[in-house]
């Protein structure tokens, strides 16, 4: 009988590798890289990363279109699943209201009207899903839809207040002598 033994070198406990910050020494699972260099680098150069600098008035058309598509999709899904004409009518109504809010919020002259229509539609669907949740006592599908509608309602309230209320000017404090 033949036997073949293959000997492999055992891994060392200390390994050294090169990184962008210099040499990194790893000892038994502990990484002792140039931590001072990393902290200095993070203090000197701040990356932009994922940063959204959009205002509510710029986000309102996207939010209203997304909410309208979700309402239409939910109405079509409920109609195909259970034949509910009420859900189909609600989905179509919500998508038409959100489409009008979408087109109105794209123009600065009609932005407040679009916010108002979005606010009214979100309030309407929050009420509908709240009543459905209270009457059926089943958390699905009325619960998540209620949370989504409350989120849209709060968004459109903030967008309406942002677009319709005038900016508050704070007077400069008295100069010190």
From Swiss-Prot:
GO CC list: chloroplast membrane
Record-linked Gene3D superfamilies: Transmembrane protein 14-like
Keywords per UniProt: Chloroplast, Membrane, Plastid, Transit peptide, Transmembrane, Transmembrane helix
General remark: For all TMEM14 proteins, 4 hydrophobic alpha-helical domains are predicted. However, NMR structure determination of the human TMEM14A showed that only 3 of these helices are membrane-spaning while the amphiphilic N-terminal helix is probably located at the lipid micelle-water interface.
PANTHER family, A to Z: PROTEIN FATTY ACID EXPORT 4, CHLOROPLASTIC (PTHR12668:SF38), TRANSMEMBRANE PROTEIN 14, 15 (PTHR12668)
Family that this chain belongs to: Belongs to the TMEM14 family.
Function: May be involved in free fatty acids export from the plastids.
Annotated protein name in UniProt: Protein FATTY ACID EXPORT 4, chloroplastic
Annotated organism of origin: Arabidopsis thaliana
């Amino acid at each position: 009988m033949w036997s073949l033994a293959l000997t492999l070198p055992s891994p060392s406990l200390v390994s050294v590798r090169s990184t962008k910050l210099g040499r990194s020494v790893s000892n038994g699972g502990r990484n002792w890289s140039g931590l001072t260099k990393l902290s200095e680098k993070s203090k000197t150069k701040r990356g932009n990363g994922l940063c959204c600098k959009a205002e509510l008035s710029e986000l309102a058309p996207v939010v209203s279109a997304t909410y309208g598509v979700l309402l239409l999709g939910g109405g079509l899904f409920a109609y195909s699943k259970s034949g509910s004409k009420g859900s189909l009518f609600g989905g179509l109504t919500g998508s038409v209201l959100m489409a009008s809010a979408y087109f109105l919020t794209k123009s600065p002259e009609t932005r407040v009207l679009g916010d108002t229509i979005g606010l009214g539609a979100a309030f309407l669907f929050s009420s509908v899903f709240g009543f459905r949740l209270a009457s059926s006592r089943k958390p699905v599908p009325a619960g998540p839809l209620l949370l989504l509608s409350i989120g849209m309602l709060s968004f459109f309230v903030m967008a309406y207040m942002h677009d319709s209320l005038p900016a508050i000017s704070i007077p400069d404090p008295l100069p010190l002598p």
